[in-house]
Swiss-Prot record:
One of its GO terms (cellular component) is cytoplasm. The keyword GTP-binding applies. The gene is drg2. One of its GO terms (molecular function) is GTPase activity. CDD domains: DRG (cd01896), TGS_DRG2 (cd17231). Disulfide bonds: none annotated. InterPro entries: Beta-grasp_dom_sf (IPR012675), DRG (IPR045001), G_OBG (IPR031167), GTP-bd (IPR006073), GTP-binding_2 (IPR031662), P-loop_NTPase (IPR027417), Small_GTP-bd (IPR005225), TGS (IPR004095). This is Developmentally-regulated GTP-binding protein 2 homolog. Residues 288-363 form the TGS domain. It comes from Dictyostelium discoideum. Belongs to the TRAFAC class OBG-HflX-like GTPase superfamily. OBG GTPase family. Residues 63-288 form the OBG-type G domain. Pfam families: MMR_HSR1 (PF01926), MMR_HSR1_Xtn (PF16897), TGS (PF02824).
Length: 364
């Protein structure tokens, strides 16, 4: 029996099994088997074949955003609207057959936007170009899930299932679980709080399903079975996602209002250029980028040349960005902006910067 058949059998058994206290142990083991089989399906073959067809795109710019969606939902159109790249768009499906990059210029940042081929149901199991598309999604800092507003909820559920099944977790954080394999000593399981969703017996059985008999497992949260499996697998991507409902010009105002109030959602119309500026601002917010401006002593800062960093960046990050030897030469920094308690403020190398701060670096 092949892997796909085993996956289908387990999924069928899970759908037949009523979920209650008596069956949660059995369902937990089934979930572990299912996750292990799906990972086997995704692992690349060891044999080397001919080179690829150029589907992968070199990462560039300050951040990467991937467009994911079913065929003919407006991915190519929005790439053309937000960037200077022309991606073939048509009213029929599967217009885009490879990955097409573009660059969004917004607030001084260069954001790489990737238009991927339309996903079809079963993509995670290899249908269409699903595996390549999902591999690109793993490398993104943000996923824009493009949805047809008239079919949005159905498409959203199917795409979430496809991404979840191959280890992409949308708008969530990794569970606070420490896991480390050992060569001997058995399973050392420690929970720092009461476990209400799994038992110690179930946790050890899931480990045994993965042929793990020696490890340290420290659980600092109250995880579900799925979260425990994620920690054991270790190959999970936690990526922020914006649900972009296109074709709002074909909807009633009541439906537009309802969709726009949903978490992590934006309603737009590519054809009529509605709400595209708001979408750009949302992309900026979700990428957690900050702009930092530098100045020389006695000179004014150049507000047309920002250094783009991640939220939480420090003076040390700025030094490394400017020159690798600047960290060792750093004496102190002077900061004007939101992060300063008073302007200007003399700061150390660990000082955290905020958006639109102005800095001056003084060397030893």
């Amino acid at each position: 029996m092949g892997i796909l058949e085993k996956i289908k059998d387990i999924e069928a058994e899970m759908s037949r099994t009523q979920k209650n206290k008596a069956t949660e142990y059995h369902l937990g083991l089934l979930k572990a088997k299912l996750a292990r089989l799906r990972q086997q399906l995704l692992d690349p073959p060891k044999s080397s074949g001919k080179g690829g067809d150029g589907f992968e795109v070199l990462k560039s710019g300050d951040a990467r955003v991937a467009l994911i969606g079913f065929p003919s939902v407006g991915k190519s159109t929005i790439l053309t609207k937000l960037t200077e790249t022309k991606s073939l768009a048509a009213a029929y499906e599967f217009t885009t057959l490879t990955c097409i990059p573009g660059v969004i210029q917004h607030k001084g940042a260069r954001i790489q936007l990737l238009d991927t081929p339309g996903i079809i149901e079963g993509a995670s199991q290899g249908r269409g170009r699903g595996r390549q598309v999902i591999a690109v999604a793993r490398t993104a800092d943000l996923i824009l899930m493009m949805l047809d507003a008239n079919k949005g909820e159905i498409q959203k559920r199917l795409l979430q299932e496809e991404l979840e099944s191959i280890g992409i977790r949308l708008n969530s954080q990794p569970p606070n679980i420490y896991f480390k394999l050992k060569s001997a000593g058995g399973v050392n399981l420690t929970a720092t709080q009461t476990l209400t969703k799994i038992t110690e017996k179930l946790a050890k059985s899931i480990l045994h399903e993965y042929k793990i008999f020696n490890c340290d497992l420290v659980i600092r949260c109250d995880p579900t079975v799925d979260e425990l499996i994620d920690a054991i697998e270790g190959r999970r991507s936690y990526i922020r996602c914006l649900y972009v409902y296109n074709k709002m010009d074909h909807m009633s105002m009541e439906d537009v209002d309802r969709l726009s109030r949903q978490p992590n959602s934006v309603v737009i119309s590519c054809n009529m250029n509605l709400n595209l500026d708001f979408l750009l601002d949302k992309i900026w917010d979700y990428l957690n980028l900050v702009r930092v401006y530098t100045k020389l002593r006695g000179a004014s800062p150049d507000f047309n040349d920002a250094i783009i960093l991640r939220e939480g960046a420090t003076m040390e990050d700025i030094c490394r960005f400017l020159h690798k030897e600047l960290v060792s030469q750093f004496k102190y920094g002077i900061v004007w902006g939101v992060s300063a308690k008073h302007c200007p403020q003399r700061v150390g190398i660990s000082h955290a910067l905020e958006d639109e701060d102005v800095i001056q670096i003084v060397k030893k």
